[in-house]
Amino acid sequence: MKITADASDPAKRKTAALCGFVLEGAAGAAGLGGPGLDDLIKEAIGKNGGKKGRISMTGTPGMPSERVILAGLGPAGKVTSDGIRSEAGRLARQVRDMGLADFAVAAPSILDPAEEAALIVEGAELALYSFDEFKAEKAGNSPRLHILGGGPSAARAIKDAQSITAGVAFARGLANMPPNECPPDKLGRAAVKMCTGKKMRCIVLKKPELKKGGFGGIIAVGQGSSNEPRLIIVEYNGGKKGQKPIVLVGKAVTFDTGGISIKPGEKMDEMKFDKCGGCTVLGIMKAVEDLALPVNVIGIVPSVENMPGGSSYRPGDIVKLYSGKTAEILNTDAEGRLILADALSYGEKKYAPSEIIDFATLTGACIVALGNNVAGMVSNDDAFAKRIEGASERTAEEVWRLPINDDYMSMIKSEVADMRNLGMGRAAGTITAAAFLKNAIGDTPWVHLDIAGTAWNQPATKKKPYNPGGATGFGVRLVAGYLKGRAQ
């Protein structure tokens, strides 16, 4: 999307749609007005009253703009950054659906001007995302966007917002790919293709290297498929030499049948989304490079296809992981923790990071506990967890911290191995899965995000204008924003 900004007079702006925001009960539009416009705006306000989620419009005869389109923000005291982001997305979709070539949006002058410019960009870019790779009829070009306002820092804010939304779009695009078009090998090739800058490089370990390296979890889960596993490693060195990196790990099961412990057939097609954690990591890495952040970040994506077959791993097997610890397999559909454990241990040992964050569509139990709008979070470090919570509030990608202690750790102890890949019955499934991961690392500050409920739009997902159907890219904005804050 082509985006520009200035502080020009809205009444003199030549555009197909002059757009703005309205507070509930207000007589005018926030940040939008001028000679000849005020009466037209009042007319449009009368059609929606500024109620959140409502769109109204009116023609603008005799003016440079062709029409005015207004989005309601709700009561003045309840306006949030995500409210502006959401309604900007609603305006963008309205403009696209009308087939207009361009639109101008007036920043409402409620929050920081540069922040408002970024929110408008995020809402519009994310709302207009379309996955049409396999359709004969493509979506076509997005309408051009001009932001009225945003202050002297608008240009930088817009550029940064576009870098982050490009990362989200990249993650969504990979996650939405069907399993026949995105096995582990192709996911690895997509990561290699992404690494074009001088500060970023990609290494992809194949099956022989994984066997030799002792990645027992990745090998076990992937051995039932003709599509061999990969370990994708993306290194971004934007910080000082010797500066400890932050390691990001993402689960990428390109299709999960459950293996021998096979899943029900209903909705199994959605298991293409079991790679969303890895796609999130790659999206963050893309955003970090585009932002040129002065930090060192490592993205590690273990990728497998979990299939049943004569060579598949079985319930009852004992698998030796990269850490040297052994895992008793009680259910082959609890595979994500096995590949993540290998990647976490490898990342900590090789890179000695300052922090580790992992992302995974790990447990259905997380959806039972938290639904489809909040990700589960488990951490071994209170200060780190609070920083991630703060970042999530800024991007409206909500997380909820769950406890972890010795009682939970004891629930994955095995009588025949160091641990088991299932907890006890249906109790605390999200936490016992995280406990398995905690066993893979030492004392490095660590946050685990279970995004099973938030990674793609599901029936109970709260519909937001900037989250169209399919993968959401959850976590890209959150962690890209967190890393940006750490770099400042």
From Swiss-Prot:
The gene is pepA. It is an enzyme of class 3 (hydrolase). The lineage of its organism: Archaea, Nitrososphaerota, Candidatus Cenarchaeales, Candidatus Cenarchaeaceae, Candidatus Cenarchaeum. It comes from Cenarchaeum symbiosum (strain A). Its EC number is 3.4.11.1, 3.4.11.10. NCBIfam families: PRK00913.1-4. Its main location: cytoplasm. GO terms for biological process: proteolysis. Binds 2 manganese ions per subunit. One of its GO terms (cellular component) is cytoplasm. Mn(2+) 1 binds at D256, D333, E335. This is Probable cytosol aminopeptidase. Mn(2+) 2 binds at K251, D256, D274, E335. Presumably involved in the processing and regular turnover of intracellular proteins. Catalyzes the removal of unsubstituted N-terminal amino acids from various peptides.
